């Protein structure tokens, strides 16, 4: 249970300063975005103790980085640096300072967008990998059509035309 097995509607940002190993790495992997301090390290070293990562890393990691790299990390228990995580697409950005500051900036940028659009975009991104090609456009329309018919969308279009930020 817990955060590693649910998909909240609101975006989750992991701010990693230092080590995210085992459960910490699995918690970060359950987030939508990961920002890290330059000194951060990620890994699932459970195999070194005769265990296996069971809070989602073995499921999520090969969906977020190349399968062979995920296999290497899971089978050896090795760590990767924040920079390597960035190169692999696991980490969104690396900060020289506190990761929390960068995460708060990113959160503020997201919060400045239309909440319905953000929630619907996240839902499509998360759920679409399960959709068959024959149904993907109709399911996406079911989720996104209400966004385009919302007050947020009307205000966004008006603000764009008037060259101002949405209210």
Task: Describe the predicted segments one by one.
Residues 35-40, 82, 91-139, 145-151, ...:
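C-terminal long alpha-helix characteristic of the crotonase
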Residues 28, 61, 85, 121, ...:
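Terminal peptide-recognition signature
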Residues 22-23, 40-45, 97:
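Short glycine/proline-centered loop/turn elements that form peptide/ligand docking sites
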Residues 23-34, 38-39, 57, 82-84, ...:
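Active-site-proximal glycine-rich helix-loop-beta segment
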Residues 16, 61, 69-78:
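Short helix- or helix-capping micro-motifs
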Residues 12-13, 20, 34-35, 94:
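Short, well-ordered beta-strand core segments
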């Amino acid at each position: 249970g817990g955060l590693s097995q649910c998909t909240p509607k609101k975006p989750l940002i992991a701010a990693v300063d230092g080590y995210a190993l085992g459960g910490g790495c699995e918690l970060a992997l359950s987030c939508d975005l990961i920002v890290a301090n330059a000194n951060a390290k990620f890994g699932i070293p459970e195999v070194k103790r005769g265990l296996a990562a069971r809070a989602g890393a073995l499921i999520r990691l090969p969906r977020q980085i190349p399968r062979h790299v995920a296999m290497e990390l899971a089978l050896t228990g090795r760590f990767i640096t924040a920079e390597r995580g960035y190169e692999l697409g696991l980490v969104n950005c690396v900060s020289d300072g506190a990761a929390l500051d960068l995460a708060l900036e990113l959160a503020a940028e997201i919060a400045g967008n239309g909440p319905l659009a953000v929630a619907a975009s996240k839902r499509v991104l998360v759920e679409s990998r399960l959709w068959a090609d024959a149904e993907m456009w109709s399911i996406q329309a079911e989720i996104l059509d209400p966004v385009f018919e919302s007050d947020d969308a009307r205000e966004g279009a008006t603000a764009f035309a008037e060259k101002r930020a949405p209210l």
